[in-house]
Structures are given as structure tokens and as C-alpha cells.
């Protein structure tokens, strides 16, 4: 009788030990259970002395109008959906992927890169920055905008990724002043620019 009791007690303990779904002590997580979802920030517009007319993301410092980004984790690059709301003026966004997302494999920080725009024919490569020489047309200005977050650490408990512009927005306003009654015919050149 005692042997049967101890055998049942041992069986009950072993079954109870197998029902825990908690991660192991080494920070590992169950495979395929924790999709990578990231809060994207950054894109602030610096030094804007006057209210400029709004164009579209990201040149105005917000995520409005950006629908997807390329997100690289390890060697794999996947297209992630951008969800932004006006609750914070579109200043932050959630990057997520419904089907086949990247997954956390542990609670340790991960290193990711992300960029927009990207070439759908080859999403694996961050495109070279190409800006229109003449950006006086709105479409040329907008198509010269590139944002990225390169090789950034993302924490499991606070998955935030700060993006920055890969290009600079420069606005030059010419005004007549002392010795100049008109700026008609003036030419402006920016020199010594680099990537």
C-alpha cells in the first residue's frame, strides 16, 4: 500500500512539474509565441522657426502616410505594417506583422535595423539615398525622404526603435536687406555636403 501511495505521489509531482509554461532560467522563450512588435519613434523636425505647411510623413516629423517598413533581424528582412494614430499627433507608430513575423527567442535585447522606403523587388537591402537635385516640386521633395534605424538594440520589456532621417531638410528664405533691394535672380549653392 505504501509503495502504491509513493508511486502515485511521485507521478502527481512529475505531471505538475510538466505543466509550467514559464521560460527557463536562461531567458529563453517558447518558440513562436512572442512576435516582435516594436514602438517606433523619432522623426522629429528640428529647428522649424515658422509654421510650415504640412506635406506628408516623414518630412513633417510624423508617421502619417507611412504604411510599411522593412525590418531586419539577423539575416532575415520582413515587411512590417506601420500603425500610427492621431492620439500623439502621429509622432509614434507600432510596427507589427500579422503573418510570419520575427519572434523573440529570449528576453535578451535584439539588434534590428529598419528603413523606409524600400524596394519591394529586393527588400533585403537598404536603398541608397538618392535625392532629386531640384526639390522645388513637392513630389520631388517627398520622394527624396529616407528614414532608418540601423543596428539598434531593442529591449524585450520596452521594444522601442528610434528612427532618424537619412537626409536633411534645408529651407532657405532670401530677403532683401541692406544694400540689396531685391533677391530676384539670386542663386544659392550648398557646398561640402556629405552623407
Give the location of each predicted region.
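Sec-type signal peptide cleavage vicinity
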Residues: 2-11, 15-195
